[in-house]
């Protein structure tokens, strides 16, 4: 089984791509063989696109089975057509969506300084409960963790009170880990849904083991 991959010849796959149960958004120009690995491993449809003209799709978008949120400047209508689910632009200055929203199909943890209006848009688009918070004191929660409908993996320096909040919000046990040989902002190097995962190519065997345990892939 293939467990690691690069996108644009970099292991920072969570910066360049994002996925849900049904869709993997990858930047235009991703190698066909990479697309094939992503599609096969995650059992989800590949959509090649740009977000606001940029290739860092993972940093600028976040979705679940109900919808996707995108940064300012994205054509929401076009994205809705491409993905087949709701598409909205996150309002306000803080809108590198993938960096600041951590979400699955039941809940979302978001940057603590997001406006009430932004919270409303997230809740209505993703159809989830939304809570402001941090992970390891970091406000960019979207890259400080990875959550699926089966598991939750976060930054190693997460605090006890943050763990309590995360477990209550997502109703999943919290596990800690890293990707790409010690990267604590592990979301930058991991794509996962409830069916499978792929990590960046620098991710070590022990790191892969933690990912598999946290996200429920151990037999």
UniProtKB/Swiss-Prot annotation:
Keywords: Initiation factor, Protein biosynthesis. The keyword rRNA processing does not apply. One of its GO terms (biological process) is cytosolic ribosome assembly. Gene3D superfamilies: L-arginine/glycine Amidinotransferase, Chain A. InterPro entries: eIF6. GO terms for molecular function: ribosome binding; translation initiation factor activity. The keyword Manganese does not apply. Belongs to the eIF-6 family. HAMAP family: eIF_6 (MF_00032). Binds to the 50S ribosomal subunit and prevents its association with the 30S ribosomal subunit to form the 70S initiation complex. This is Translation initiation factor 6. It comes from Methanosarcina barkeri (strain Fusaro / DSM 804). The gene is eif6.
